[in-house]
């Protein structure tokens, strides 16, 4: 409902309300789908976890409020809701103009297929700035995915991700690091 604009525009939906929609969705997913695996120590790979919510919502606030929002979101999800805090976050940094061209290709030029966020280039540019800010605030690894106009080949991005994951796994399991 939110991404389709059914409850209001980006500007009309309160940042904390929108964040809570996603937080509750993550909580339900955790409780019903993957909490057992997490508690048993299995490696969980997530796309668009709390970190994505942070980037998309904090841009709606004045920048002077970003640190407070990030602290609030971490407290809500990791402390109050008990969701697991990520051990490693890799932000794939793609220039929004390049991303927009890729989306146009994916959707065959049909603008109606874009969600509320994808349809707004200024918003996407703002989200990238917010993501880079959050990466610094929370200590994420940032991997550039384009040269400013063209995306890097998927194999190159994949290799950069593997380097970061391998380094993280070696730090987490030093006795087993020869097996990675």
Model-derived features with residue positions:
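Short, polar/charged, Gly/Pro-enriched helix-capping and turn/loop motifs at alpha-helix termini
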Residues: 36, 44, 87, 171-176
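ATP-dependent small-molecule kinase phosphotransfer cores
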Residues: 1-75, 80-81
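Short loop/turn elements that form and flank the Walker-type P-loop nucleotide-binding site
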Residues: 39-40, 84-85, 136
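Hydrophobic/aromatic beta-strand patches that form the interior of the parallel beta-sheet core
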Residues: 45, 88-90, 141-143
């Amino acid at each position: 409902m939110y991404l389709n604009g059914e409850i209001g525009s980006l500007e009309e939906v309160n940042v904390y309300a929108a964040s809570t929609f996603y937080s509750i969705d993550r909580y339900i997913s955790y409780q019903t789908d993957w909490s057992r695996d997490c508690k048993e120590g299995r490696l969980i790979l997530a796309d668009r976890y709390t970190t994505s919510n942070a980037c998309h919502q904090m841009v709606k606030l004045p920048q002077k409020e970003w640190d407070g929002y990030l602290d609030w979101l971490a407290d809500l999800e990791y402390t109050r809701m008990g969701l697991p805090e990520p051990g490693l976050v890799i932000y794939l940094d793609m220039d929004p103009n390049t991303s927009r061209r890729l989306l146009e290709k994916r959707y065959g030029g049909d603008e109606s297929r874009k969600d509320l966020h994808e349809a707004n280039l200024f918003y996407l540019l703002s989200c990238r700035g917010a993501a880079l800010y959050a990466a610094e605030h929370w200590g994420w690894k940032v991997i550039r995915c384009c040269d400013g106009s063209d995306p890097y080949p998927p194999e190159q991005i994949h290799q950069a991700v593997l380097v970061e994951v391998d380094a993280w796994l070696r730090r987490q399991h030093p006795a087993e690091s020869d097996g990675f």
